[in-house]
């Protein structure tokens, strides 16, 4: 594998171990030219996925883009990185296992919402605020109430209960 730092065409594997509950292999590599170390992951890819955007555009599915959007919602949340990786792997497996190569951006968003709801309520609401395009505070209130998340955030001040 080419070194991402100096471009040397061959790197050495220093350590290799299972990751993501055995669904991936994590490899630590070192470049013999510049001595830089980096990590790679090897995963099974059942099929090439294409995401159909709301605009009609079709783009290749990008696991890293999915990871970045979830990491943004998880910012400053005390969640183990392995749990996030497991959630992402689960989403990808579900998308690949449908047998379809085309998936809608809505379907990807729904799966992320489902995963975050089970993982962290604050991250769930953060992601929803972008995915569902919240524009005002009332949008948050309605979403939290509609999604029965009051147990996570407490009752509204104007509730009579």
UniProtKB/Swiss-Prot annotation:
Residues 11-23 have a biased composition (Basic and acidic residues). It comes from the Bacteria. Residues 1-23 are annotated as: Disordered. Disulfide bonds: none annotated. Negatively regulates transcription of bacterial ribonucleotide reductase nrd genes and operons by binding to NrdR-boxes. Belongs to the NrdR family. This is Transcriptional repressor NrdR. It comes from Maricaulis maris (strain MCS10).
């Amino acid at each position: 594998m080419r070194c991402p730092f100096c471009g040397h065409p061959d790197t050495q594997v220093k350590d290799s171990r299972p990751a993501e509950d055995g669904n991936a292999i994590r490899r630590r590599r070192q470049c013999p030219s510049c001595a830089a170390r980096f990590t790679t992951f090897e995963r099974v890819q059942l099929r090439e996925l294409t995401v159909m955007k709301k605009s009609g555009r079709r783009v290749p599915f990008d696991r890293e883009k999915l990871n970045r959007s979830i990491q943004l919602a998880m910012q400053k949340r005390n969640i183990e990185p392995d749990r996030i990786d497991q959630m992402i792997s689960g989403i990808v497996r579900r998308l690949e296992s449908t047998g379809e190569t085309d998936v809608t951006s809505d379907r990807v968003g729904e799966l992320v919402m489902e995963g975050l709801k089970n993982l962290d309520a604050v991250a769930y609401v953060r992601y929803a605020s972008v995915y569902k395009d919240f524009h005002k505070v009332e949008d948050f209130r309605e979403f939290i109430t509609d999604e029965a998340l009051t147990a996570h955030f407490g009752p509204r001040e104007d509730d009579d209960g």
